[in-house]
A protein has these predicted regions:
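Structured catalytic/nucleic-acid-binding cores of DNA maintenance enzymes
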Residues: 1-264
């Protein structure tokens, strides 16, 4: 994308319907946590997939693989022999603003866990400010750490041997954070997420999506429940998500009933 001229532009959200980027050039494309930023001369397009969004790339004129009514952003870029078209479907967030507003747009986010030189100390500090909170909720909160989603949360907790409902103050939460960073860094350039080291279909995760399947370590059936947590950096309003864990490898916190399926 970088260096290509915009030859067509359509923002299909009311607030930005009159924005035109034709004639500008793409200067830079970069992620911050779960957010994607694209700079076109002196303006930035900011998007977030949330739960349903996706980006598709086509040649201009080709049939889209997803329905037209789901498109929120359409950008045509100069290319030979045919221009290419980027289509953002079902995007949960779309913004356009000037360069000076970039830092304000990420002000509520914690350090990006996938930056080469990320601010681990700041992430640790933010998590430690709420010691009574569950580690599962703390990891998912983008105000603590930007970038961790539900799959990596579940897998990091399993690999670290920590129940997702365990309180921050009762565990080595820095170790869990380091595990999350390590498995995410290992997957950052891969089209397939793998935490087990095995790329075969159905064998890529330890607990995520494996309810009632045997634990890959001890054979105990993986359990599934719900864990509350506010994702301040993008998934506003989604206060709980499904979580998976092994009741043997990740024992429930003492005095809780959170080792039972369906706990909330």
């Amino acid at each position: 994308m970088e260096g290509r001229e915009v030859t067509g532009c359509s923002f299909r959200v009311p607030r930005y319907a009159t924005v035109h980027l034709e004639g500008t050039s793409c200067q830079r494309v970069w992620p911050y946590g779960k957010h994607l930023f694209m700079q076109f001369d002196d303006r930035i397009v900011h998007t977030h997939l949330k739960m349903e969004g996706t980006w598709a790339i086509h040649y201009v004129g080709d049939r889209w693989r997803r329905p037209a009514h789901s498109a929120r952003v359409v950008l045509a870029l100069a290319n030979r022999p045919r221009d290419i078209e980027l289509v953002g479907h079902w995007l949960g967030l779309v913004e356009v603003f000037g360069l000076d507003d970039y830092y304000e747009s990420i002000a509520d986010l914690g350090p990006d866990i996938l930056l080469p030189r990320w601010d681990r100390e700041e992430a640790v500090r933010r998590i430690s400010m709420r010691p009574g909170r569950s580690i599962g909720a703390a990891l998912l909160d983008q105000g603590n750490v930007a970038g961790i989603g539900n799959e990596y949360r579940a897998e990091a907790c399993f690999i670290a041997g920590v129940h997702p409902a365990a309180r921050v103050e009762d565990i080595d939460y820095e170790h869990v954070l380091d595990v999350a960073r390590r498995i995410m860094w290992a997957n950052k350039d891969s089209p397939i997420r793998v935490t087990t080291g095995v790329r075969r279909a159905g064998e890529t995760t330890y607990v995520f999506g494996r309810n009632n399947a045997p634990c890959r370590r001890c054979g105990t059936l993986i359990q599934k429940g719900f864990l509350g947590g506010v994702d301040a950096g993008g998934d506003e309003g989604e206060l709980e998500r499904v979580i998976w864990w092994c009741p043997v490898c990740q024992p429930a916190p003492v005095g809780s009933n959170r080792g039972q399926p369906g706990w909330r």
